[in-house]
Structure formats: structure tokens, C-alpha cells
Amino acid sequence: MTVELSPRATELAEHARQLLAAGGYNGFSYADLSEKVGIGKASIHHHFPSKADLVLTVVRRHRQQSAAGLAAMQQHIGDDPQAQLSAYVDYWARCIRDGSSTMCICAMLAAEAPMIPPEIAAEVRGYFQDLSEWLAAVISQGQAKAQFKPEAAAPVEALALMSTVHGAMLTARALGDPEAFQTIVRAAIHRLAV
């Protein structure tokens, strides 16, 4: 299902995404969003009756954008699994370095899973399932092409790499060192290739 939004709702969703990446579900309110966008809370409620509606929309958009981004990257790079993994982690390295997105919103929301509405938690799980399946497919292709020699089955390696990528985001944030992300994830990819 594609999420279609008006220009104002798109603007609200994008600012909400930034607030989610910075502080998670409980880290912002409609008052914060109102201040950031420069409209009243009533106008926000017109587009998104509740915070849960807003965040669910943001997560669905993130999921769609991620899937489209991975597909476009694969099409651009071609059939080179190692280059695909490198491009994936390089994307996040750039986002962390330039500050445009220092943390995946789904990672932030996953940490809050017991406290967020179930429909949002389900969408977050879907994001991680999608990503894990993509990573497993890339790792399997890399194994078939003798680019990777994983120690475990591709789905297990995918979960490990996914956990490493999101943990590296957290580490880079905690240390205040964007380069820590790249160092950690490059080591993980190197272990696959050895």
C-alpha cells in the first residue's frame, strides 16, 4: 500500500521523521512539531488525528522508501552482492556523517516497542523483516558467487549484520563519533568476505 499525502501532510511526516530519529516516539509531541513546522496543533490534527496515526504513516513511508531505495541501488549497482552491502552501509555512513539521519527511526521505535501502539510495533517488525530478507538474499548471492564465506546460514548472518548496522548507529551516537559507524560495519562485512 503506497502512502499518498498532501504537500502539508508530507511536510509534517518528514519533520516527524526527524523528531523520531532524534528522540523516538515519546521524545516529541504535537507541540514540538507545531513549533518546527510553524502551524497550530489543530492543523496537525486535521492531517493526523492522533500521534499514532502520524507515526504509523511515517513508518509506512520509511518502509516504502527503504524498499524503493534498495531496489534502485540494486538496479544501479547490478549483480555484485559485496558492492550492494557496501552501498547500503555507505548510505547510512553518509547520513550519520552529515547529520541528516543519525539513527534509523525503526531502530528507535524498536527500542520503545513495549510502549508504542501495537500497529506501529507491527509495522516496525515488518521493516526489520523486509531488511533481513533483503540482506539474506544478498548474502546468499554473495556466497553463490564466492564473495562471501558466511559462518552461519544466510538468514542468521543477515540478522547479525542487521543488528550490527543498527548497533553501530547507536555506538556512533553514544560516542559522538560518526566514523565509529563505518569502522564497525566494515569489520562486519569483512568477516563475511573472509
Residue ranges and their predicted role:
Residues A83-Q84, D98-E119:
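Amphipathic alpha-helical segments used for helix-helix packing
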Residues Q82-A83, A122-G126, A144-A160, E179:
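All-alpha amphipathic helical-bundle segments outside canonical DNA-binding/catalytic cores
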Residues V55, V59, R63, A121-S132:
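Amphipathic, non-transmembrane alpha-helical scaffold segments
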Residues A107, A152-T171, A187:
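Hydrophobic alpha-helical segments that form the core
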Residues T2, A83, A87-R94, Q129-Q141, ...:
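C-terminal peripheral helix-coil segments that are non-catalytic and often amphipathic
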Residues L5, E11, H15-T57:
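Helix-turn-helix
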Residues T57, R61, A71-T102, A154-L161:
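Hydrophobic alpha-helical connector segments
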